[in-house]
Amino acid sequence: ALVYHDISQEQLLLLITQAVQAELQKRSRQVPVGISVRHIHLTRDDVDKLFGYGYQLTPKKALSQPGQFACEECLDIIGPKGELKHVRILGPERSATQIELAQTDCRNIGIKAPVRSSGDTKGTPGVTLRGPNGTLTVPEGVMIADRHIHMTPAQAAAFGLADGDRVQVK
């Protein structure tokens, strides 16, 4: 049994929603599909810089990947040739700040970003992020996310899949 201390009502609701979604998906061979080509993952340090020390991101909506959520908070992304306004932050916080954009977004702001797997930020271009507490220039982290599917280990096992497998989606 899991024991949670100091958990907010929003976090509890998020955990319950994710548990119900996981149970429903166990009963189905269908996998829900969502597309999210424009979002930001932040480190704890970068949340502090952009929103103020100790600020806690606010969960807005649970995502299909357990423990992941879209936040109420958004940032502006500033590149050499333009900017993207109100880009959603995804939580929870990460070990490295990462900005996932569509190829069109990159072209519009003047960035040449590579197609990469999530987390593979080494050698990628950087941008400036603007939040309510000021701006922050991140030296790397902009990428076009490679196509992928988020599944729980139980879902993957039900389909006979392992991490890194290639699939066709119909």
Residue ranges with predicted function:
Residues P32-P80, K85-P132, T137-Q168:
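Short beta-strand-centered segments at strand-helix junctions
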Residues A1-R27:
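Short, low-complexity, charged amphipathic interaction modules
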